[in-house]
Design a protein with these regions (language model features):
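Long C-terminal appendages of very large multidomain proteins
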Residues: 4-6, 14-442
Length: 442
């Protein structure tokens, strides 16, 4: 049953990787047998030991992402609990449909199973009903993308040819794309300083975006030349042409780009916004509120904030962590904080921000995302932090929530985890798959 729930969670896109779970009987696992013997040797069974036994020993090596392991252990705690043993008709979720039937004859279990709905409600997996909408949207998008790829490339009547469409689109993007940043001007105005790590962050961001815009500009110029017969249409340019024709970001761009799942039009708009934010920073100095989603490499900004605090207060940076304060302001702050930074641009998926009670709350029906107000990053010594009545919410760059597993044990799509005030136990939001996203897909 646990395997079925985990695979369904993956289908509903609340887990990060497709699970390749151990298919043999759990009892055959040597570590499980060893711990099982130590459990049954006691007169009172240790239910609490079963969760880590199965979660860490049986599945631990196969579920490599630590956020997936957290979800796995949370789901296990639903099944390995004294309430399930002691209560008759133990309910697995809200409502009267899904529960563990009371002890009875074999046929009573069969009758209960036959009474269950054919299509399971997301609540049985701990998810909000909106999870079905997310799944259906993604399946529909995949279907439409496949249909687009099968359409003929010839146009009839007075419609524009594919070549004309791509050429006009290329010229439009080129007209909007700004010139590369002058690295030397940035270095002269914001030199490397021990007291201000943000200067280094800015310079690194400018260099990264220059590389990206150079690839975008060169590919668009060459596409226009190839369509006019001035140069040969290489396989790389053909890939750019085909991607632009169906509204996708070309692989050549994605290889040099920050992670993004946006279609081509939204991607270009987003890129131009990021470039403008950097230009404003260069012209007017560091903003009072940083657009967290606008950084090419978000971790460098977080490291810069930590370094500034560590150097100012002469504390080893290894001892530094962040506390988080969700403010009531949505877009603007009058002054910069003395320590830390204000950030904006995060979207909450799987829950919403209750602005009245200043805690995370249940999503409203058919509203999949909720923008978070400005958040204050407050660096400090980690051993002095108090972690009470919070949900440790992971932040991802895109809604895919998956990437390459890095040496830290986190996905490359993962940014950090922020503590959000909550009036419910963490388990509730873990099962909901609640996370923050730096950008949406549209």
């Amino acid at each position: 049953m646990l395997k079925a729930i985990m695979l369904e969670d993956e289908t509903l896109h609340q887990s990060h990787v497709i699970f390749s779970l151990y298919q043999g009987p759990m009892e055959d696992h040597p570590i499980f047998r060893s711990i099982h013997l130590s459990i049954i040797s006691d007169q009172h069974p240790h239910i609490i030991l079963l969760s880590p036994t199965v979660g860490e020993c049986n599945y631990g090596g196969r579920v490599t992402d630590d956020k997936d392991r957290r979800l796995l252990l949370s789901l296990l705690s639903t099944f390995y609990s004294w309430e399930l043993i002691e209560q008759d008709c133990y309910h697995l979720c809200e409502g009267d449909v899904y529960y563990v039937p009371a002890h009875g004859p074999y046929q009573s279990y069969v009758n209960y199973i036959r009474s269950l709905p054919i299509c399971a409600d997301p609540c049985v997996f701990g998810l909000h009903s909106n999870a079905d909408i997310t799944k259906d949207n993604q399946e529909t998008n995949q279907l439409l993308e496949g249909i687009l790829l099968t359409l003929p490339r010839q146009s009839g009547g007075g419609a524009k040819s594919p070549q004309e469409v791509v050429e006009e689109l290329s010229e439009d993007i080129l007209s909007k794309l700004r010139a590369d940043f002058d690295i030397q001007v940035v270095m002269d105005k914001y030199p490397v300083m021990y007291e201000e790590s943000m200067n280094t962050v800015l310079r690194q961001e400018v260099i990264r975006f220059n590389r990206l815009t150079e690839v975008v500009r060169d590919s668009l110029v060459n596409i226009c030349k190839a369509l006019k017969g001035q140069i040969v249409m290489s396989s790389e340019l053909e890939n750019v042409f085909n991607s632009m024709l169906v509204g996708k970001v070309p692989a050549m761009w994605a290889a040099k780009s920050y992670p993004s799942l946006k279609p081509l039009g939204s991607y270009v708009t987003d890129l131009l916004s990021r470039l403008q934010v950097l230009q404003n920073w260069i012209d007017d100095g560091p903003p009072s509120v940083f657009w967290l989603s606008g950084f090419y490499f978000t971790q460098s900004f977080l490291t810069g904030v930590s370094q500034n605090f560590a150097r100012k207060h002469t504390i080893p940076i290894d001892y530094i962590g962040f506390e988080f304060e969700v403010t009531k302001e949505e877009t603007h702050m009058e002054e910069k904080p003395k320590d830390g930074a204000y950030v904006r641009g995060l979207f909450l998926e799987g829950a919403r921000w209750d602005r009245q009670n200043m805690v995370i709350g249940e999503s409203l029906p058919k509203i999949l995302f909720d923008s978070l107000p400005i958040i204050k990053l407050k660096p400090g010594e980690m051993d002095k932090f108090q972690h009470e009545n919070i949900y440790l919410c992971p932040v991802y760059k895109t809604s895919a929530r998956r990437g390459t597993l890095s040496t830290t044990g986190h996905s490359t799509n993962y940014v950090l985890s922020i503590e959000l005030p909550s009036d419910k136990p963490q388990k509730h939001w873990i099962n909901r798959g609640v996370a923050c996203l730096c950008q949406l897909d549209d």
